[in-house]
A protein has these predicted regions:
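Transmembrane beta-strand segments of Gram-negative outer membrane beta-barrel proteins
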Residues: 1-38, 62-68
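Repeated loop/turn-to-beta-strand initiation elements of outer-membrane beta-barrel proteins
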Residues: 23, 61-64, 131-134, 186-189, ...
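Membrane-embedded beta-strand positions of outer-membrane beta-barrel proteins
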Residues: 27, 66, 136, 180, ...
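Transmembrane beta-strands of outer-membrane beta-barrel pores
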Residues: 31-37, 70-74, 129-131, 140-142, ...
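Residues that define the transmembrane beta-barrel architecture of outer-membrane proteins
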Residues: 35, 44-50, 116-121, 128, ...
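Residues on the lipid-exposed face of transmembrane beta-strands in outer-membrane beta-barrel proteins
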Residues: 50-56, 66, 122-127, 178-182, ...
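Outer membrane beta-barrel
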Residues: 61-65, 69-75, 80-209, 424-428
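Outer-membrane beta-barrel "beta-signal"
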Residues: 439-463
């Protein structure tokens, strides 16, 4: 084994040394295996990933970068798909209409899944100038100060294929855009032009992590100059305080499902009202500020944003208890406050966030104030070779929790092992007002996956 490992290292070293001047590459091979230990038990993924990063420097002021991602999930090769993605609470099987073919008995629920693929994650050209930089291409831009919170950081939409359980960089959907930075003293001025308009990507229909879906009649926003997204950011450190101001004119990443109802009042004649869904994306204007200040071992940080143009789902109770759905446009404020410190050699972080809907009315399905909290702890042991971590997120209004303890073992500079558990708690959905019946139209974000707790292991080889 020692000789084999030496030959592999020698091969990679020789390959890198033989590359043309200015060409660099790096990447990793990784296996992610997850086991759901609640009935029905199953290996929910045996995902193998190959990532390759290539950079070429033409001249010191011009650099091309690409990051590709190839994956294959072996779990579907040796397990039944209906075991990997069991039926969730409030889910039902739609029988075929007359004349339609019978469903596949091996996939009677018509579960969608993506077992393999090749993705171009990032591809951009960097232009470096004395007082400015330009980045053109497919990229990820993160504006937030408080790690992990989407208050100011709303540029790239999210991939919910695996809920929010993937690494942060894997959750962001890269967009084609132009980013320009201009440096003036302690300040950086940043501008964005984003012609690539996309929304959040839901998990495949009826897959293990399926929750929200894009409605069938949804028409994406046409990609043209008029429909582009625009953003600006000013950042810098003044008087020991990190400060950020952002402004983003963008499309809502969650399409609004406008509903029109005809035939109301005909129920007594045995005629059901007809509901027509018209999913559309709406423009939002988001302006915000972020601050961070260090006081010795304690760092206080926060962000606040004012969002204009948001549409919220509404539910009116008609005579006889029937629901009439609609939408209401209301601005909202979102903020997060955080504190970070070091205690007994451990990095600790505590955050509290609120979404506040202005001019709220009782018919809006979301609470006027939504409260969220998180706690993160991390400590390096044995010179950094062992790193235990704990992340806890709670949606306070509905008493939902996500617990993520994990242990990272750095075997060498190139080989890393990771062991962890994901635990969801909470009710799968909110109750219909005045009843004990769960409302299938108001699924909870964490509680819906209360039966999907899992243990997982990752093995990663970097080069």
């Amino acid at each position: 084994m020692g000789g084999e490992g030496f030959l592999k290292r020698l091969t990679l070293t020789h390959l890198k040394e033989s590359l043309p001047q200015g060409l660099e590459f790096s990447g990793y091979l990784k296996n992610e295996t997850a086991y759901r230990y609640q009935n029905p038990v199953a290996f929910s993924k045996v995902l193998n990933i190959f990532q390759l990063e290539v950079a070429y420097t033409f001249i010191p002021s011009l650099r091309l970068y690409a990051r590709t991602w190839a994956f294959y999930d072996l779990a579907y090769d040796f397990q039944d798909i209906q075991t990997i993605a069991p039926m969730k609470p409030l889910e039902f099987i739609q029988p075929p209409d007359p004349g339609e073919p019978e469903p596949n008995i091996e996939n009677i629920r018509e579960i969608s899944y993506d077992p393999s693929g090749v993705l171009l994650k990032e591809f951009y050209l960097d232009v470096f100038m004395p007082s400015a930089d330009l980045r053109i291409g497919k990229q990820i831009v993160r504006w937030g100060i408080v790690e992990g919170w989407r208050v100011l950081d709303q540029i790239n939409p999210l991939d919910f294929t695996e809920h929010i359980l993937r690494d942060v960089t894997d959750r962001y959907i890269p967009l084609w855009m132009v980013k320009a930075d201009y440096y003036l003293g302690p300040l950086t001025f940043e501008g964005l032009w984003i012609p690539d308009v996309r929304g959040h990507k839901p998990a495949p229909i009826r897959s293990e992590w399926s929750q929200f879906q894009v409605l069938p009649d949804f028409n994406p926003v046409p990609r043209n100059f008029e429909n582009s997204e625009w953003g600006g950011r000013i950042s810098g450190v003044l008087g020991g305080v990190e400060m950020v101001y952002t402004s983003l004119y963008h499309w809502d990443d969650f399409p609004t499902a406008f509903r029109s109802v005809s035939g109301l009042g005909l129920g007594s004649l045995g005629i059901s009202p007809e509901v027509t869904f018209t999913p559309v994306q709406r423009r939002l204007q988001t302006n915000g500020i972020g601050l961070s200040k260090s006081f010795g071992k304690i760092v206080l940080e926060g962000e606040v944003a004012y969002n204009q143009g948001k549409y919220w789902g509404t539910e009116f109770r008609a005579e006889g208890g029937a629901s009439v759905f609609g939408e209401a446009q209301r601005d909202f404020v979102t903020h997060v406050l955080g504190v970070k410190t070091v205690l007994f050699g451990a990095d600790l972080s505590l955050n509290f966030s609120q979404d506040i809907i202005l001019k709220h009315v009782p018919e809006i399905q979301q609470d006027r104030i939504e409260n969220t909290g998180s706690f993160f702890a991390r400590k390096e042991i044995r010179y950094g070779t062992l790193v235990p971590q704990l992340l806890v997120i709670t949606l306070i209004n509905r008493n939902e929790w996500l617990y993520r303890p994990k242990l990272e073992f750095k075997y060498s500079d190139k080989v890393t092992f990771l062991f962890g558990i994901d635990i969801f708690t909470g009710a799968p959905a909110e109750k219909i007002p005045g009843t004990e019946t769960l409302d299938p139209g108001r699924l909870n974000f964490f509680g819906y996956f209360d039966k999907d707790d899992r243990a997982y292991m990752e093995v990663k080889y970097s080069f």
